[in-house]
């Protein structure tokens, strides 16, 4: 699947959830569906098998999820099954979570450093970049000695490279 298709489905579901003030519920329900499908190999094989009829998948979804998730998530799952997009469920869920987090003012950041950062350093980076982007950042720290020093911060599709390795490479190219 192209991620553009998944994003369109996620955006459509997000708009419905937003209009009904059910973003949190839909996110939790969709997460429960994803967890159930991904956590059970037999269920996953059935739901993702291209030669199993949509009617059979819809009946199975009805038995497993109708009384356990809200109307929006359940109906959305049926739309995916009808359109042959159930294989894209995980990607759609990830896109939905990203949209929900953006609406809440959250962003995920991956901070790569040569040595482990202290909690204080992580909080300071989260605060400074959070203020710049007007977001509350959730930091994930990664240690990569190859960057030599400094930090590389990835937030969404933005990359802030303050690593010593990149600075040395840039300097060497200019020399």
Curated annotation (Swiss-Prot):
SUPFAM superfamilies: N-terminal domain of the delta subunit of the F1F0-ATP synthase. It comes from Brevibacillus brevis (strain 47 / JCM 6285 / NBRC 100599). The gene is atpH. It comes from the Bacteria. InterPro entries: ATP_synth_OSCP/delta_N_sf, ATPase_OSCP/d_CS, ATPase_OSCP/dsu. F(1)F(0) ATP synthase produces ATP from ADP in the presence of a proton or sodium gradient. F-type ATPases consist of two structural domains, F(1) containing the extramembraneous catalytic core and F(0) containing the membrane proton channel, linked together by a central stalk and a peripheral stalk. During catalysis, ATP synthesis in the catalytic domain of F(1) is coupled via a rotary mechanism of the central stalk subunits to proton translocation. It is a peripheral membrane protein. PROSITE patterns: ATPASE_DELTA. Belongs to the ATPase delta chain family. NCBIfam families: ATP_synt_delta, PRK05758.2-4. Its main location: membrane. This is ATP synthase subunit delta. One of its GO terms (molecular function) is proton-transporting ATP synthase activity, rotational mechanism. One of its GO terms (cellular component) is plasma membrane. It is found in: Cell membrane. Disulfide bonds: none annotated. The keyword Ion transport applies. F-type ATPases have 2 components, F(1) - the catalytic core - and F(0) - the membrane proton channel. F(1) has five subunits: alpha(3), beta(3), gamma(1), delta(1), epsilon(1). F(0) has three main subunits: a(1), b(2) and c(10-14). The alpha and beta chains form an alternating ring which encloses part of the gamma chain. F(1) is attached to F(0) by a central stalk formed by the gamma and epsilon chains, while a peripheral stalk is formed by the delta and b chains. Keywords: ATP synthesis, Cell membrane, CF(1), Hydrogen ion transport, Ion transport, Membrane, Transport.
């Amino acid at each position: 699947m192209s991620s553009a298709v998944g994003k369109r489905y996620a955006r459509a579901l997000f708009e419905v959830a937003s209009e009904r003030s059910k973003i949190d519920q839909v996110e939790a329900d969709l997460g429960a569906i994803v967890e159930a499908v991904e956590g059970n190999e037999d269920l996953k094989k059935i739901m993702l098998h291209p030669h199993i009829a949509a009617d059979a998948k819809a009946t199975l979804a009805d038995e497993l999820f109708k009384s356990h998730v809200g109307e929006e998530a359940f109906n959305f799952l049926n739309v995916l099954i009808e359109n042959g997009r159930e294989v894209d469920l995980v990607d759609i869920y990830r896109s939905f979570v990203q949209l929900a987090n953006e609406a809440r003012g959250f962003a995920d950041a991956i901070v790569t450093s040569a040595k482990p950062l202290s909690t204080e350093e992580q909080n300071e980076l989260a605060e400074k970049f959070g203020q710049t982007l007007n977001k509350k950042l959730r930091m994930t720290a990664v240690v990569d000695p190859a960057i030599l020093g400094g930090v590389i911060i990835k937030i969404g599709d933005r990359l802030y490279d303050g690593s010593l390795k990149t600075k040395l490479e840039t300097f060497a190219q200019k020399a």
